[in-house]
């Protein structure tokens, strides 16, 4: 029997509980969780990653819910999905994907994957990389050496 594969994608810059929640919830949808980590040069919809792609990949690979982690393709985001052939593709609550458009693009490539948007992580006030960076800047900018 073929394993039910789930693909999750993201930048995963400065890992935080929101990322772990997204990947944990994604893993519940199948037998194997494959994570595609965005390449540095492909992150265009938000500030460039602070951590280089190899380091982000290593961090994601070390997380318990993750069975396989790979870097995305340099030019075509669907190439790894063509190879993995997932049953499900998950999208984070704040990822810039139109689910219907994505379903259409998958259908054009004969990839009948279900598309599922994972909800927002609600526990804690530092559940985004942006908020973590902001807290660090505020703490260091004020001369306070503590972060917390």
From Swiss-Prot:
Catalytic function, reaction form: FMN + ATP + H(+) = FAD + diphosphate
GO biological process, one term: FMN metabolic process
Alphabetically ordered keywords of this record: ATP-binding, FAD, Flavoprotein, FMN, Nucleotide-binding, Nucleotidyltransferase, Transferase
Enzyme type, top EC level: transferase
InterPro entries: Archaeal_FAD_synthase, Cyt_trans-like, FAD_synth_RibL, Rossmann-like_a/b/a_fold
Highest taxon of the lineage: Archaea
Keyword Nucleotidyltransferase annotated: yes
Any one Pfam family match given in the protein's UniProt record, by short name: CTP_transf_like
Subunit text: Homodimer.
Chain's role: Catalyzes the transfer of the AMP portion of ATP to flavin mononucleotide (FMN) to produce flavin adenine dinucleotide (FAD) coenzyme.
Similarity comment text for this entry: Belongs to the archaeal FAD synthase family.
The protein's name: FAD synthase
Organism: Methanoregula boonei (strain DSM 21154 / JCM 14090 / 6A8)
Gene label: ribL
